[in-house]
Amino acid sequence: MSTVSAALIMFAVSSPFTSIAKSAEFFSIGTGGPTGVYFQVGNAICKMVSKIQSAEHGRKKGTDKAYRCSAPSTGGSTYNIGQIMQGELQFGVAQSDWQYHAYNGTKPDKVKPFDGLRAVFSAHPEPFQIIARKGSRIKDWNSLKGKKVNIGNPGSGQRGTFEVLMESHGVDTGYFGSTSELTSSEQSGALCDKKIDAFGYTVGVPNAGVAQSTDGCGAYIIDLQTDPVKKLVSDNPFYAFATIPKGTYKTSKKDVTTFGVMASVVTSAAVSDELVYSVVKAVFENLDDFKKQHPAFANLDPKKMIKDGLSAPLHPGAVKYYKEKGLM
């Protein structure tokens, strides 16, 4: 059984629309690794969709406009965009930089050009973090040379960002002693088991996977303020400097400066206005509840959600809702 079909079945069991399965429209939201915040974004959206439809229609009333939502774990940003382009997913969570590159066709070797990509809203900020193993003697980018580094699985946003970072510093994987392609759910365990010395991760703060390594085995996040990083931020509108505050994790003894992107929810121009409108309505009319689903969502602001990190055009279904509510 595939991941997507398994997720659909599990959601159907708990959905208030089980009795109207024949009239419900199924849709899926591509997320990321099960320990990452993207997985939480997708499942929080599904919760809000279920909540608003249950309130509007009730378990017994039924409706010919019901939706059934699943949010399976996936390979991440570029995978999600590719699956949306192929029509296998209706929505996906993606880093703002990969949204930009997909829509504008500026990195065709990393993500296929897709001018049918449409933005829905942005979510939380995502600092790119390099987490180093206790005792590794890694203190900055230069000290990663010769170390065992996980650069992320192919198709993930963290892999893409790590490759951009390597390119900006004029190095390739040969700069490191060895590289691995572990997923986000595998890397913290590997670090604590001393199988790797460091890993890169683009993720909202705080994150359970990062805490597994920092709080569990004394790993720490390093500063990323090299001249190439400063140039990346100045040259690209989808990047910004980010601070991980002191006290975020047990080993966060001081503020750490790095750079990052925004997490964004994207879809295709081929997805119906009605479906996109319904999803946006479910999230924005339950935003207080949505913000409680993960600490990274605590500071979400509706006015910023409809513009920050969005380089693809907004989907007409989203625009309709935002205009109705006076947000644009």
Give each language-model segment a name.
Residues 147-164, 237-307:
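Ligand-binding clefts/hinges and TM-proximal coupling segments of bilobed small-molecule sensing domains
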Residues 96-98, 106-107, 136, 172-266, ...:
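Pocket-lining segment of extracytoplasmic ligand-binding domains
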Residues 186, 193-194, 203-217, 221, ...:
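An extracytoplasmic/periplasmic, membrane-proximal ligand-sensing/linker region
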Residues 24, 66, 76-79, 86, ...:
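Extracytoplasmic
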Residues 22-95:
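N-terminal (or domain-start) structured segment
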Residues 3, 9-20:
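C-terminal segment of classical bacterial N-terminal signal peptides
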Residues 89-124, 204-208:
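Acidic, polar ligand-binding/catalytic clefts
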Residues 26-58, 126-193, 288, 304-308, ...:
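Bilobed "Venus flytrap"/periplasmic-binding protein-like clamshell domains
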